[in-house]
């Protein structure tokens, strides 16, 4: 904890000369931001987002799927989940972060698993919103949809797909520099905005996007990353919180989003970028910790360091771990011999939670900390995480 107090009050991250004032201001700002953030997300959740909560007995698990790492089995699982979610969600597409994760998952589905079908749906989605991000200028949640816009732009090269999200990020980069109010104050934001900036760099060749992303990433990391556990606190209000067993409170889903953001940034970052080794090191540190606390069923509980307190796995976080670990192995960043057994066990665990209709269960609803949910709870962002995981597992199977 001393590391975090020191970082929060570091002269490079604040203007106030008083450490106590700096820390108190940061905690108050973060607490208010959390309240505002959750309030903004508290709108009624439609059936396309939350489709769970039915008794498990009335929803039989799928019997036509296998968790084996073969092309045939991985693609079949991806199709089943993607088809079910697309059929339910397309009439209710949204610009918010929950759907942005789903869209990234649809974009990741390989051609061999009917990827074009889902990309075509994403093109229809983008046209529906005129390729605009969400309404909040500086909020990373409303920028995350830009990942899909930019991935489509790289295939189709229609300027309409690029211009609005580029203008949004240009505007964000012109906001006043308030180092005592980090732009990305919650760890999930590292999935939302950084990949957009990294993709803009790749597309435009303008390094300002990558440099801005790099600066903001390490400001957030210095505040929320625990160098002892190699995990991220959800936000500054969690720095002093503990599980019932005395361990720090580290949220599975939040850390999953961070690891997914890490690999999506690394996918765009040049190998000679000066700070790239820091991202690789952070991925390797987090991967080692995550592998060491994997559950017997291959999955991870909502509170990472007190798994016995949570009866169900949390599959959106678990899927993002599979995605990041598989990407690391596929790209030579993580040792195959060490992590392949972890991935195999985790993928089989995820597939075991797919129901006959195609939904994937055990997904915690919107929140900011470990919470309760049913085995059938299913949300669009969890589906997106599963499809992203499948895309890398399918590569691994090759």
Regions of interest found by a model, annotated:
Residues 90, 114, 130-134, 157, ...:
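Helix-capping and short linker residues that terminate individual alpha-solenoid repeat units
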Residues 47-100, 107-128, 132-146, 152-156, ...:
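CBM-like carbohydrate-recognition segments
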Residues 40-42:
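Boundary at the C-terminal end of the N-terminal hydrophobic targeting segment
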Residues 187-191, 198-304, 311-322, 334-363, ...:
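Extended ligand-binding clefts on enzyme/binding-domain cores
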Residues 22-35:
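Bacterial N-terminal signal peptides
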Residues 162-194:
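Asp-box/WD-like beta-propeller blade repeats and closely related beta-sheet repeat scaffolds
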Residues 1-20:
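N-terminal secretory signal peptides that target proteins for export/translocation
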């Amino acid at each position: 904890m001393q590391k975090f107090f020191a970082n929060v009050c570091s002269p490079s991250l604040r203007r106030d000369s008083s450490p106590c004032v700096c820390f108190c201001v940061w905690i108050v700002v973060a607490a208010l931001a959390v309240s505002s953030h959750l309030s903004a997300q508290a709108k009624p959740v439609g059936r396309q987002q939350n489709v769970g909560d039915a008794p498990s007995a009335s929803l039989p698990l799928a019997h036509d799927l296998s968790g084996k790492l073969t092309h045939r089995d991985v693609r079949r699982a991806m199709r089943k989940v993607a088809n079910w979610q697309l059929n339910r969600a397309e009439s209710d597409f949204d610009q918010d972060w929950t759907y942005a994760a789903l869209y990234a998952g649809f974009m990741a589905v390989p051609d061999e698993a009917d990827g074009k079908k889902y990309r075509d749906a994403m093109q229809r989605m983008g046209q529906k919103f005129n390729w605009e991000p969400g309404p909040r200028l500086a909020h990373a949640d409303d920028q995350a949809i830009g990942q899909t816009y930019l991935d489509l732009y790289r295939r189709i090269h229609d300027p309409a797909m690029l211009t609005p999200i580029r203008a949004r990020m240009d505007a964000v980069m012109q906001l006043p520099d308030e180092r005592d109010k980090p732009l990305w104050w919650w760890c999930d934001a590292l999935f939302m905005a950084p990949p957009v900036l990294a993709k803009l760099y790749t597309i435009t060749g303008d390094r300002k996007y990558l440099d801005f992303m790099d600066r903001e990433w390490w400001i957030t990391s210095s505040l929320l990353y625990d160098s002892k556990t190699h995990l991220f606190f959800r936000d500054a209000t969690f720095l002093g919180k503990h599980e019932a067993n005395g361990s720090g409170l580290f949220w599975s889903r939040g850390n999953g989003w961070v690891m997914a953001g890490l690999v999506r940034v690394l996918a765009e970052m040049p190998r000679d970028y000066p700070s790239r080794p820091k991202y690789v090191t952070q991925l390797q540190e987090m991967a080692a910790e995550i592998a060491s606390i994997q559950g017997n069923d291959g999955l991870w509980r909502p509170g990472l360091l007190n798994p016995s307190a949570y009866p169900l796995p949390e599959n959106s976080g678990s899927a993002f771990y599979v995605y990041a670990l598989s990407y690391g192995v596929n790209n030579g960043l993580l040792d195959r011999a060490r992590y392949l057994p972890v991935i195999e066990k985790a993928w089989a665990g995820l597939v075991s939670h797919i129901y006959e209709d195609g939904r994937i269960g055990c997904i915690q609803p919107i929140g900011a900390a470990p919470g309760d949910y049913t085995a059938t709870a299913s949300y669009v962002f969890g589906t997106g995480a599963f499809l992203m995981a499948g895309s890398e597992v399918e590569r691994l199977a090759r």
